[in-house]
Amino acid sequence: MRPYQRTGVAWLLHLFRNELGGILADEMGLGKTLQALAFLSSLKKEKDSALPSLVVCPASLIENWRRETIRFCPEFQVLVHHGSTRTSVPTSLTGYDLIITSYGTLIRDKEIFENLPLLCVIGDEAQYLKNRKTQNAQAISALTSEGRILLT
């Protein structure tokens, strides 16, 4: 990791430890996904938690998140909750370190996620959440988690 990425991870950990949310914003291609994954990996070790974290992103980025997670956090058990093969049983979402879904799937499967305790929620492409009256913003706000981070 580059020094500015390490600083970003340290800042995300500081926010989480102080029960604050935050927005990690920079230019495209500077490693926000890597920083978020390093943050989640550090958090998982620090908290020794069995709770999964959730990444909510545009459908076009799901595969990128899955690939980057396998590359940078091979120890993570990852579930992509998207498409026609996704589960409708909330208990089948337990046992994972990271669940990746899209904003549209989160809205459609709101009942599944509303009662699922999460370690951290990461909303990628935060412009999808600018208006708090939208279904995207309401669905992500309804989630129960110990921390929340947005990326943009």
Locations of regions flagged by a protein language model:
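ASCE P-loop NTPase motor core, strongest for the SF2 helicase catalytic module
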Residues: 1-152
